[in-house]
């Protein structure tokens, strides 16, 4: 039916919708539901077509559970390239975590998740590490530090079922 009625469909990434939900909430305390944020989230993709034209977006907010705001923020940070998850293989010796914090993280980086189980009789122990960056551009430096200081790691952001 939609093919007969609609001119075209446009997909908007979930993380972009989440970022769009947070913007009016943070700036003006306006609560927008995901469906209500879709039209605003899509505007960037049509900037060339709508420049100089009057555009109306219908925004609604009644179908939003405030308990989901943390999840919405998480997805927004992932989309914006500000949150990254890794499996980091730590040497099983005192001081390994301190070295990680001192050498790998930048001054504005924050560990937001850390799950580690010490393994006995093993030289290396894996940990799930979530890192929030202040600036998207800091990601390349973070990865360069992993390599420079020989920390074994696996990036997980491409598969969110892993974290």
Each model region followed by its residue ranges:
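Glycine-rich phosphate/pyrophosphate-binding loop at beta-loop-alpha junctions
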Residues: 1-4, 41-91
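N-terminal start-of-chain detector that recognizes signal peptides
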Residues: 29-30, 57-62, 99-105
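Fold-independent oxyanion-binding glycine-rich loops
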Residues: 12-15, 20, 34-35, 42, ...
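Charged/polar, solvent-exposed surface patches and flexible loops
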Residues: 4, 19, 23, 57, ...
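A conserved regulatory-domain signal marking ACT and ACT-like small-molecule sensing domains
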Residues: 66-163
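Active-site-adjacent helical/loop segments in soluble small-molecule enzymes
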Residues: 1-53
């Amino acid at each position: 039916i939609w093919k007969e009625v609609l001119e075209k469909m446009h997909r908007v990434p979930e993380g972009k919708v989440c970022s769009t939900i947070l913007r009016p909430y943070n700036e003006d305390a306006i609560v927008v539901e995901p469906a209500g944020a879709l039209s605003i989230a899509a505007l960037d993709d049509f900037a060339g077509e709508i420049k100089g034209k009057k555009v109306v977006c219908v925004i609604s907010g009644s179908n939003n559970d405030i308990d989901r705001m943390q999840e919405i923020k998480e997805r927004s940070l992932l989309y914006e390239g500000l949150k990254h998850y890794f499996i980091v293989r730590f040497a099983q010796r005192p001081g390994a975590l301190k070295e990680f914090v001192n050498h790998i993280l930048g001054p504005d980086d924050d560990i937001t998740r850390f799950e580690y189980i010490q393994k006995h009789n093993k030289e290396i122990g894996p940990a799930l590490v979530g890192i929030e960056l202040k600036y998207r551009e800091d990601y390349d430096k973070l990865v360069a530090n992993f390599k420079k200081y020989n920390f074994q790691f696996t990036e997980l952001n491409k598969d969110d079922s892993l974290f």
